[in-house]
Amino acid sequence: MKTKSILTLATTLALMSFASTAVQAVGVGKLCGGFAGIQCNPGLFCQHKAGACFIFDIAGTCARVPRFCFRIFRPVCGCDGKTYGNDCERQAAMVSKSHNGKCQ
């Protein structure tokens, strides 16, 4: 019975520490996403390494969401399967990059 109580307490403490990490927001260049589900501060998004689309629990880094993008046509493919006119437009949509060039 004592072992069960200790195990229950340890599990509860582990879940509490995980929950507090999951709601924590972080700034530019800081680690985000991943197993802990760390969120970025407002005005930022969690950008994953290019080509790392649809990988469960992968971490990224917080990047600024651009407010203005120049109209330069250099298409990139987002992890959402959409082709963006340039990398700035992709970042403004808060989408990680799959690859340079149009989506297939």
Role assignments for model-derived ranges:
Residues 25-104:
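Secreted, cysteine-rich disulfide-bonded mini-domains of extracellular proteins
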Residues 20-23:
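Signal peptide cleavage region of secreted peptide precursors
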Residues 1-9:
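Bacterial N-terminal signal peptides that target proteins for export
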Residues 10-17:
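Bacterial N-terminal signal peptides
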